[in-house]
Regions:
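Metallo-beta-lactamase
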Residues: 3-81
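C-terminal regulatory/interaction regions
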Residues: 86-129
Length: 129
């Protein structure tokens, strides 16, 4: 999901989440080969592991519960998808990723817009099928 070669490894009481779930913040979907459908499916699989496994991310601090965090990451992605859908209602169905970023991320530091653009590109690909 995050990238085409992104994996998580399940251990007895922990999950090495790589970049699928980070220790802080949210994962950027790579604009070249990241796939939102695959990413959401990965989050669903991590939720299905059940609560109680520590998340050991590729970046940032360990997190106490992989399933709880996967659920929160999925909710965040669904919220962003709703925001992108709303932006397309205003901007039109053919809006470019950058136009959507300007609309959805207007309150976010502009230095983060390139990363946001990559995620929006993946979201638009997902929504446009």
């Amino acid at each position: 999901g995050h990238t085409a070669d992104s994996v998580s490894l399940v251990l007895d009481d922990a999950v090495l989440t790589g970049d699928t779930i980070l220790g802080a913040g949210s994962t950027v979907l790579d604009g070249k080969d990241g796939d939102l459908g695959d990413y959401l499916a990965s989050l669903d699989r991590l939720q299905q592991l059940g609560e109680g496994r520590v998340a050991l991310p590729g970046h940032g601090p360990d997190q106490p519960d992989t399933a709880v965090l996967a659920r929160a990451y999925r909710a965040h992605r669904e919220q962003r998808l709703d925001q992108v859908r709303a932006a397309l209602d205003v901007l039109g169905p053919d809006a470019t990723p950058m136009k959507v970023v300007r609309h959805v991320y207007a309150d976010v530091d502009k230095t983060l817009w390139p990363a946001a653009r990559m995620s929006v590109k993946a979201q638009l690909t997902y929504l446009r099928g």
